[in-house]
Regions:
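Conserved ATP-binding/catalytic motifs of P-loop helicase motor domains
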Residues: 2-182, 186-390
Length: 390
């Protein structure tokens, strides 16, 4: 390794470096072969093209949907401890240089690589991202009314009441805005009680109310912040006086098992808490809440020997509400398939850590950390630094 980084001046030099980086485990064999194949197929001798293809493949291997050109360090493109190479390219002219490659197209063009707003994509992943964004945007704009029964139930579910203003449902954009800017949120129950007594919002109630009124809801927060409690109360509201086909899914079998146990425990707690309100609430709604969670693959229906699933746009899932736990672990292609199989009028609730979805930021193709929330000011999104367990 040289004392100072060398300048990439030929495709042969890049080819040798790709092999070296593979041996150093900075790249995978797939990253190297993808770059070499792209250069060979498109007869592109540029060393910059080779390097960008390798970096893009590495991004996909790291669960990112694209390569933001602005993130490339020209003096150390692979973030090596001891840089071995630097790019002989003007950073200001990089986007134009990339756009001029024959294999790179603009959005809407049929090219293997797509350049959009300074982000380089494989066309397949660009299409995944666009479809997911369109569906979520449509769902985020769809609202449902809350009945007087639901308003009364909310006050029973969340005692003591936050304030008696006569308005139990909270506008989602207001809830989202206040959630993102509230720097005084505390985690211990004593502080939470003080907060309620002083008239500040009960964010668990806000989350439940906003999610009830929207087709798309995103409830985020770390472990122990009360996401499952919030969802259980929301499901009870949805089951009051109606029959809903509700399905629970998670990315893996272990995650599905954890969700099953969490919902069971939450239902038991809720039934005990609401016993004093048996005359006011239909506690039978708790029994309607499903407990068994499945994996996303099982829900969609795996077809042995095929990458396709039994459920898709032409054979949609039979459900009214889908809850996806650990949604940030669902990769972009799978989320695209899941949304494709979702009935047009079905509700969707995404649970997990702060979710970073495409179209709103260069995002991991595992998705999905901040911007489903940032994008859907019209949808229901409540981040839970500490949603209390009532």
């Amino acid at each position: 390794m040289t004392d100072s980084p060398s300048i990439l001046q030929s495709s042969q030099a890049v080819t040798a470096l790709l092999k070296q980086w593979e041996e150093q485990r900075l790249l995978t064999a797939l990253d190297r072969h993808f770059a070499l194949q792209m250069a060979a197929i498109h007869r592109e001798p540029s060393p910059l093209f080779l390097l960008l293809c390798a970096l893009l493949s590495r991004q996909l291997s790291s669960q990112h949907a694209c390569l933001p050109l602005g993130s490339i360090a020209f003096d150390n493109p692979l973030a090596e401890p001891h840089p071995s190479v630097r790019l002989n390219t003007d950073p200001a002219g990089l986007e134009l240089a990339v756009a001029n490659f024959a294999a790179v197209g603009a959005p809407g063009e049929d090219k293997p690589l797509i350049l959009d707003a300074g982000r380089l994509y494989l066309k397949r992943y660009y299409d995944f991202e666009c479809r997911v964004a369109r569906r979520l945007t449509t769902m985020a704009a769809t609202e449902y009314p809350a009945t007087d029964e639901v308003r009364r139930a909310l006050d029973c579910l969340f005692l003591p009441p936050v304030s008696h203003t006569g308005q139990a449902t909270i506008d989602a954009s207001e809830a989202d805005s206040e959630t993102q800017t509230d720097s005084e949120t505390q985690t211990n129950s004593e502080t939470q009680t003080n907060r309620e007594n002083s008239g500040k919002r009960d964010w668990q109630k806000v989350a439940t109310a906003t999610a009830y009124c929207r087709q798309l809801a995103v409830i985020t927060g770390g472990p122990g912040t009360g996401k499952t409690t919030t969802v259980t109360k929301l499901l009870m509201l949805l089951c009051l006086g109606s029959e809903m086909n509700i399905r629970l899914v998670a990315p893996t079998g272990k995650a599905a098992a954890r969700l099953t146990e969490s919902i069971k425990a939450s239902k038991q707690r809720l039934a005990k808490e609401l016993m004093p309100f048996a005359a006011e609430l239909d506690l039978g709604a708790i029994d309607k809440i499903p407990e068994e969670a499945a994996t996303v693959h099982r829900l969609l229906g795996v077809i042995p020997g095929s990458h396709k699933f039994r459920h898709h746009q032409d054979n949609p899932l039979h459900l009214d509400l889908l809850i996806v736990d650990e949604a940030s672990m669902v990769d972009l292609p799978m989320m695209d398939r899941l949304l494709d199989a979702l009935p047009a009028n079905a509700r969707l609730i995404l649970l997990g850590i702060r979710i970073n979805w495409p179209r709103w930021k260069p995002a991991p193709c595992s998705p999905i950390s901040a911007p489903v929330c940032a994008t859907s000011r019209t949808g229901a999104c409540v981040t839970a630094p500490s949603l209390p367990r009532h």
